[in-house]
From Swiss-Prot:
GO terms for molecular function: ATP binding; ATP hydrolysis activity; ATP-dependent protein folding chaperone; protein dimerization activity; unfolded protein binding; zinc ion binding. PANTHER family: ATP-DEPENDENT CLP PROTEASE ATP-BINDING SUBUNIT CLPX-LIKE, MITOCHONDRIAL, ATP-DEPENDENT CLP PROTEASE ATP-BINDING SUBUNIT CLPX-LIKE, MITOCHONDRIAL-RELATED. ATP binds at P120, T121, G122, S123, G124, K125, T126, L127. Zn(2+) binds at C15, C18, C37, C40. The keyword ATP-binding applies. Residues 3-56 form the ClpX-type ZB domain. Component of the ClpX-ClpP complex. Forms a hexameric ring that, in the presence of ATP, binds to fourteen ClpP subunits assembled into a disk-like structure with a central cavity, resembling the structure of eukaryotic proteasomes. SUPFAM superfamilies: Glucocorticoid receptor-like (DNA-binding domain), P-loop containing nucleoside triphosphate hydrolases. The gene is clpX. The keyword Metal-binding applies. This is ATP-dependent Clp protease ATP-binding subunit ClpX. ATP-dependent specificity component of the Clp protease. It directs the protease to specific substrates. Can perform chaperone functions in the absence of ClpP.
Length: 423
């Protein structure tokens, strides 16, 4: 096809779509008997982008995806945790269905159901929240509860969470008011003792008190540029009633509180008392009740704002091996892509993947530790790779993972044969 820009030609050409002449646009692209200008091309791109954002499922804009559809999307990115995914899918479906029908005056007001994710580190809590936001194409922000303090103290105000959500929505207040907020490390703001203290706890119980109104629904006054408030400053008013709050934490030690409660209930002649040490942490967390969270250090009002509790299990070796290679953004796929950009094939043997997963189990870092292990294995190879022209493949086996030898570098001969060359 030919590009024609505006010239002083006798025959003036026009865009077949908008009718503008070649002198009114920057570029006019010629096709068989038709022309299209650069403005129409840009408009077509915008239309395609908007349709892509609306989703590839054929849903009309404003339709709420079914729980099974939400769960299927979560399955593409998160391995295992089937029960947690079902709980999340139903809760989020009901939340956005509530928003869609909130204007109907039938006398029934649907309450908001914020979500608490309980599970060990590296089990997928953060990834679940991120995937949910991607599914609904809504503003999403993450906050670390350990950095939050009460207003007026050194640290980050809880209202800064809403500021981050505004920034994620390009300061579109209406869009931000339907976003998702994920607060990580929520177990780190528990009060220091089960009984109320006479001393001020500005980073524990004080933060829980400050978060209460945000989570229940209030109009937050947010300074557009962040920072501390002062009287002369203009504020953005954000209604948090329809913002979905998801809180996550490892809650280390909660399993022991649950085990103690279950053991007390089993006292008596003929009672079957299971050894708490033989129970898996995930099995105990599934039996968590509000009274356990209160004993852990959350205040009753805060627990009441989190009616939906989803528990996640420790990931076993098989799950970690699957995480390494199957999700859409799997770690092995990411590093294979990096090597592919250097025209080199990266291969992990099954034994190597098993060894990487076992090392992550020993480190007790869950799926989060897989990337650092793979990065350490491939670091020297990635350093040398741009300077090596004859390498066609790099093979990682179990001995490489265990540090017994260097990654196997495969070089190509002129006759397209291959031979192995140790690094």
């Amino acid at each position: 096809m030919t590009k024609l820009s505006g010239t002083d030609s006798k025959s003036t050409l026009y865009c077949s779509f908008c009718g503008k002449s070649q002198h009114e646009v920057r570029k006019l692209i010629a096709g068989p008997t038709v022309f299209i200008c650069d403005e129409c091309v840009e408009l077509c791109n915008d239309i395609i982008r908007e349709e892509t954002k609306a989703g590839l499922t054929g849903r009309k804009e404003g339709d709420v995806p079914a729980p099974s559809e939400i769960c299927a999307t979560l399955n593409d990115y998160v391995i295992g945790q089937d029960r947690a995914k079902r709980v999340l899918s139903v809760a989020v479906h009901n939340h956005y269905k509530r928003l869609k029908h909130s204007g109907k005056a039938d006398g029934v007001e649907l309450a908001k159901s914020n979500i608490l994710l309980v599970g060990p580190t590296g089990s997928g809590k953060t990834l679940l929240a991120q995937t949910l936001a991607r599914t609904f194409d809504v503003p999403f922000t993450m906050a670390d509860a350990t950095t939050l303090t009460e207003a007026g103290y050194v640290g980050e105000d809880v209202e800064n969470i809403i500021l981050k959500l505004l920034q994620a929505s390009d300061y579109n207040v209406d869009k931000a008011q339907h976003g998702i907020v994920y607060i990580d490390e929520i177990d780190k703001i528990t009060r220091k003792a089960e009984n109320p203290s006479i001393t001020r706890d500005v980073s524990g119980e004080g933060v829980q008190q400050a978060l209460l109104k945000l989570m229940e629904g209030t109009t937050a006054s947010v300074p557009p540029q962040g920072g501390r408030k002062h009287p002369q400053q203009e504020f953005l008013q954000v209604d948090t009633t329809n913002i979905l709050f998801i809180c996550g934490g490892a809650f280390a030690g909660l399993d022991k509180i649950i085990a103690d409660r279950l053991q007390k209930r089993s006292i008596g002649f003929g009672a079957h008392v299971a050894d708490p040490d033989k129970r898996k942490v995930g099995e105990l967390l599934e039996k968590s009740e509000p009274e356990d969270l209160l004993k852990f250090g959350l205040i009753p009002e805060f627990v009441g704002r989190l009616p939906v509790i989803a528990t996640l299990h420790d990931l076993d070796v098989d799950a970690l091996v699957t995480i390494l290679q199957e999700p859409k953004n799997a770690i092995v796929k990411q590093y294979s892509k990096l090597f592919e950009l250097e025209d080199v094939e990266l291969t992990f043997t099954d034994e190597a993947l098993q060894a990487i997963a076992e090392r992550a189990i020993l480190r007790k870092t869950g799926a989060r530790g897989l990337r650092s292990i793979v990065e350490g294995i491939l670091l020297d190879t990635m350093f040398d790779l741009p300077d090596l022209d004859d390498i066609s493949e790099v093979v990682i086996d179990a001995d490489v993972v265990e540090g017994k030898k260097e990654p196997i570098r495969v070089v190509s001969n002129d006759d397209d044969g291959k031979k192995e060359e140790a690094a």
